[in-house]
Amino acid sequence: MKERIKAICLEKPNNVVVKEVPYPEKSDNDVLIQVESMGICGSDIGAYRGTNPLVTYPRILGHEIVGRVIESGIGMSDGVRVGDRVIVDPYVCCGQCYPCSIGRTNCCESLKVIGVHIDGGMQEVIRHPAHLLTKVPDNLPIHQLPLAEPLTIALHALHRTTLKSGEHIVIIGAGAIGLMAALAAVQYGAIPILVDILEQRLEYAKSLGIEHIVNPHKEDDIKRIKEITSGRMAEVVMEASGANISIKNTLHYASFAGRIALTGWPKTETPLPTNLITFKELNIYGSRTSKGEFEEALDMLATNKINASHIITKCIKFEEIPSFISDLSDHPENYLKINAVF
């Protein structure tokens, strides 16, 4: 066994390096996983910029992680064995608080997200709770598999709002999560309307079959959404950008008796016209991380309902992660999704 392994460590804001760290030690309830592939997430970029208040430094990054189980632990599901390829559920809950007691473990009062609150999976070998694993399908390339994690975030918002066939859903933000939410909405039989200020992302979404795209910088967004929905506005709105103005706009985009999922994380407080919440009797749902969506996400990728190659802009080597984190921070418009492999 190696005494030290390579890891991607964020020493402080704007300083991310490949460094050696001790080989992980596991408890009885943990597994050890030989990491094979990983995704770079927006939260990694926020940590790099120093804008994520939940991150402390130094921190090993990464929560979109796929690899092979090399040591078993108590609590592994019956279908997982040593040697199996798995994706990790990166949300570690206490199991004791009120949200955990009602099955809403993603709302745990002391939730620990790997790569954010505790060290993450961008390293050669990781220790992880044995019960937080899902076996992955055999028919997907290794570099595509980490995409299932951000897809669970998109699916969770659709589930929170109980999106139904035939409904319109406005999705604000045409990044990876917003685009996958739109593609998943099509699979649900719903009608997505994708809103963004980056025209190239909207045009790309249209090339993938998203018929309705709206750029508020180029047209009257309220008027256009009203036209698409025959005057009703959208029964469901998902906010996936975290921009304050976009959060405010959810109240205008939603129909009377509409439902809103807030998925994006704003950096500052957002003043809202709360009279609209009462006037329209809107249901507003926080949509944090995910809960129980990994199997559906993996199935969507494995059956090509969502084509991973349409989302992943670039696949890089592990050692290239620091330079691409820097470039992604400086030029986010150039990449939809970057995944890495060993």
From Swiss-Prot:
<dbReference type="InterPro" id="IPR050129">
    <property type="entry name" value="Zn_alcohol_dh"/>
</dbReference>
<feature type="binding site">
    <location>
        <position position="41"/>
    </location>
    <ligand>
        <name>Zn(2+) 1</name>
    </ligand>
</feature>
<feature type="binding site">
    <location>
        <position position="100"/>
    </location>
    <ligand>
        <name>Zn(2+) 2</name>
    </ligand>
</feature>
<dbReference type="InterPro" id="IPR013149">
    <property type="entry name" value="ADH-like_C"/>
</dbReference>
<keyword id="KW-0862">Zinc</keyword>
<keyword id="KW-0560">Oxidoreductase</keyword>
<dbReference type="InterPro" id="IPR013154">
    <property type="entry name" value="ADH-like_N"/>
</dbReference>
<feature type="binding site">
    <location>
        <position position="97"/>
    </location>
    <ligand>
        <name>Zn(2+) 2</name>
    </ligand>
</feature>
<comment type="similarity">
    <text>Belongs to the zinc-containing alcohol dehydrogenase family.</text>
</comment>
<dbReference type="Pfam" id="PF00107">
    <property type="entry name" value="ADH_zinc_N"/>
</dbReference>
<feature type="binding site">
    <location>
        <position position="63"/>
    </location>
    <ligand>
        <name>Zn(2+) 1</name>
    </ligand>
</feature>
<feature type="binding site">
    <location>
        <position position="149"/>
    </location>
    <ligand>
        <name>Zn(2+) 1</name>
    </ligand>
</feature>
<feature type="binding site">
    <location>
        <position position="94"/>
    </location>
    <ligand>
        <name>Zn(2+) 2</name>
    </ligand>
</feature>
<keyword id="KW-0479">Metal-binding</keyword>
<dbReference type="InterPro" id="IPR011032">
    <property type="entry name" value="GroES-like_sf"/>
</dbReference>
<dbReference type="InterPro" id="IPR036291">
    <property type="entry name" value="NAD(P)-bd_dom_sf"/>
</dbReference>
<dbReference type="Pfam" id="PF08240">
    <property type="entry name" value="ADH_N"/>
</dbReference>
<protein>
    <recommendedName>
        <fullName>Uncharacterized zinc-type alcohol dehydrogenase-like protein HI_0053</fullName>
        <ecNumber>1.-.-.-</ecNumber>
    </recommendedName>
</protein>
<dbReference type="GO" id="GO:0046872">
    <property type="term" value="F:metal ion binding"/>
</dbReference>
<dbReference type="GO" id="GO:0016491">
    <property type="term" value="F:oxidoreductase activity"/>
</dbReference>
<feature type="binding site">
    <location>
        <position position="108"/>
    </location>
    <ligand>
        <name>Zn(2+) 2</name>
    </ligand>
</feature>
